[in-house]
């Protein structure tokens, strides 16, 4: 889970960003994601979100962002409407100091 908002900020260099984007793009390719595929992002505002967006763009796929407050039903309808090939999420995150799970909504 991402750390609570009272934690120090995380900084990365452009070189680190490029490395992370390339690793993520290669991971997507290994899942069979190709140019034109839609990839659903069901994540809070964490550093991995822009990394995922850049990796998706790098391979020519299309990212679709879904608000992390949606329930499993709301998420499912958006996945179907977008015809997403892959859904990327996190275990959970903190909102207003309370942990909120996300992965169970995808499962």
Curated annotation (Swiss-Prot):
InterPro entries: AMP-dep_synth/lig_dom, ANL_N_sf. GO terms for biological process: acetyl-CoA biosynthetic process. GO terms for molecular function: acetate-CoA ligase activity. SUPFAM superfamilies: Acetyl-CoA synthetase-like (SSF56801). It comes from the Archaea. This is Uncharacterized protein in acs 3'region. It comes from Methanothrix soehngenii (Methanosaeta concilii).
């Amino acid at each position: 889970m991402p750390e609570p908002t009272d934690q120090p900020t995380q900084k990365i260099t452009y070189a680190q960003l490029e490395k992370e984007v390339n690793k993520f793009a290669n991971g997507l390719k290994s899942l069979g994601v190709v140019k034109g595929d839609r990839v659903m992002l069901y994540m809070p505002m964490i550093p991995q979100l822009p990394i995922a967006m850049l990796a998706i763009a790098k391979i020519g796929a299309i990212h679709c962002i879904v608000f992390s407050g949606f329930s499993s039903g709301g998420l499912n309808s958006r996945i179907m409407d977008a015809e997403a090939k892959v859904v990327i999420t996190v275990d959970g995150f903190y909102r207003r100091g309370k942990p909120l799970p996300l992965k169970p909504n995808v499962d």
